[in-house]
A protein has these predicted regions:
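Pocket-lining segment of extracytoplasmic ligand-binding domains
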Residues: 172-267
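Secondary-structure end/capping motifs
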Residues: 233-313
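Short, glycine-/small- and polar/acidic-enriched structural segments
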Residues: 23-169, 179, 183-189, 200, ...
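Extracytoplasmic/secreted envelope proteins and their assembly/folding machinery
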Residues: 41, 72, 87-90, 127, ...
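Short, low-complexity disordered leader/linker segments with a strong preference
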Residues: 1-28, 332-335
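Short, solvent-exposed loop/beta-turn-alpha elements that line the ligand-binding surface or hinge
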Residues: 55, 122, 208-219, 287-296
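Conserved C-terminal helix/tail region of periplasmic/extracytoplasmic solute-binding proteins
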Residues: 301-335
Length: 335
């Protein structure tokens, strides 16, 4: 009897130790994002609405800064613990001496579209023709800004010859174009689909599909990721793993979800007043989400090449792209 009691006690201790080891070091944390309603960041909303964060023992407060550059600034400044943002931010920050790393890929295609006001259709044939125009982006310094910089440089122009205006990622972005406050817009769905439906714009460059992404970049180009300061990752490995687990569950759910399933899960405000249009935008964007959560070496190189096209300092920098992505957490996810 005593032996059985001792064995039972030992087993209980082991279970307790295992549970303690698996528990997140920091259960309550803040996460920044730059335009949460955008389909670019849909995995975040799915993880939140489906309760995947809570299932991993996390209490996540989400702060929407309206643009990716602002959420990055919040991470650097210490006001958020993690960011759902563009992968290229990890590359740019390494050049600046900031060790920020992605831990899971959420989007395998950018999904960004450069569209121009319909009245300019006759004279704008390439991004270089945007010279002297006002271009709306989610926020200056965001991935939507980089996208235009790259396209202009690729077409032989200079991005300094246009004016970038932050218009956000929702109804405000649509209104800015409809009111004539901007001549072109670099944004994502559902904003772009809304403007297309209204025939307010025509599309100049579209990275919502694999074919479109290859036409623009010559190959794959990772988009949204979850990134954190490497110092946080090293000090909070269980918290990081829990975050990755939650986002991976969201990717798995999205892999088989129908547009109606997505519409039933997200807040109604995401529809921009048109549920049918939103579901059509979801349908057009389903191809963009990562299937594995892993960023390939080719994807890293493609993202770097995009930035180097218009950033001379980055082009000359000696960067180690392997330090922009930590793959061990995705590999540790229980499939």
């Amino acid at each position: 009897m005593k032996i059985k009691m001792l064995l039972a006690a030992a087993a209980a201790v082991m279970l307790t130790a295992t549970a303690a080891q698996a528990a997140p070091e920091k259960a309550k944390l803040t996460l920044g994002v730059g335009g949460k309603p955008l389909l670019y960041y849909l995995p975040l909303t799915i993880a939140e609405q489906k309760g995947y964060f809570k299932a991993e023992g996390l209490d996540v407060e989400i702060n929407d800064f309206g643009g990716g550059a602002k959420s990055l600034q919040a991470l650097v400044g210490g006001s958020v613990d993690a960011v759902t943002g563009a992968y290229e931010h990890t590359i740019r920050m390494q050049e600046k001496g900031q060790d920020i790393r992605a831990v899971i890929e959420l989007g395998r295609f950018p999904g960004i579209v450069l569209a121009v006001k319909t009245e300019h259709q006759g004279k704008v044939k390439s991004a270089a023709d945007l010279k002297g125009m006002k271009i709306g982006v989610t926020a200056p310094g965001s991935s939507t800004n980089f996208f235009v910089n790259y396209l202009i440089a690729k077409a032989g122009g200079n991005y300094k010859d246009v004016a970038f205006i932050g218009v956000g990622a929702g109804a405000g972005a649509v209104a800015a174009m409809q009111k004539g406050e901007i001549d072109a817009i670099s944004n994502l769905d559902p904003v772009i689909s809304k403007l297309e439906m209204d025939k307010t714009v025509f599309v100049l460059a579209d990275s919502r599909t694999e074919a479109g992404t290859k036409a623009i970049f010559g190959g794959s180009n990772p988009a949204a990721v979850l990134y954190l300061k490497n110092d946080f990752i090293e000090k909070n490995p269980q918290t990081t793993q829990a975050l990755v687990n939650a986002f991976h569950k969201a990717l798995v759910w999205l892999a088989t979800a129908k547009p109606a399933d997505v519409a039933a899960t997200v807040p109604e405000a995401y529809y921009l007043g048109d549920k049918a249009l939103y579901m059509e935008a979801v349908k057009n964007s389903m191809e963009t989400y990562s299937r594995t959560g892993v960023i390939s070496p080719d994807g890293m190189k493609s993202a770097y090449n995009m930035l180097a096209q218009f950033d001379e300092g980055l082009a000359k920098a000696n960067l180690d792209l392997n330090k922009t992505f930590v793959d061990k957490f995705v590999k540790a996810v229980k499939k």
